[in-house]
Design a protein with these regions (language model features):
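Catalytic-core regions of core metabolic enzymes
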Residues: 1-119
Length: 119
């Protein structure tokens, strides 16, 4: 996806970051001490009333919610994708996110430069 007017894109779509109707949590974990679990737990605890889609190829459920193997397997539209994965997996997930036509992405990972990657 090439964005010709990035500022306009952000202002037009900021609502999807601040008040998304649905959130996919990529890297959702069954383990309560992991970031991918904490994201879902926080959303549930703080009363988020939109749809939450845990994404984990090795789990059927995460935090009581049906899990999906990939972003592309989610049957509905996704407003926000939260990525809680190691840096080497982020590019692949971003490509899926673009194909899914998600509106916004939040990435929580090690900084690429810190691990010797400049991409």
């Amino acid at each position: 996806m090439k964005i010709d007017a990035p500022r306009k894109y952000v202002t037009d779509n900021l609502k999807y970051a601040l008040d998304p109707g649905s959130i996919a949590v990529v890297g959702a974990s069954r383990y309560p001490n992991k970031v991918g679990y904490k994201v879902i737990e926080g959303l549930q605890k703080w009363g988020y009333d939109g749809k939450i889609y845990p994404v984990n190829p090795r789990a059927d459920k995460v935090a009581g919610l049906k899990a999906y193997p990939t972003v592309m397997d989610i049957p509905d539209d996704v407003d926000l994708v939260s990525i809680a994965l190691p840096a080497h997996l982020v590019k692949m997930v971003l490509e899926e996110t673009v194909k899914k036509k998600a509106k916004m992405v939040v990435i929580a990972t090690s900084a690429f430069k810190e691990i010797g990657r400049g991409d």
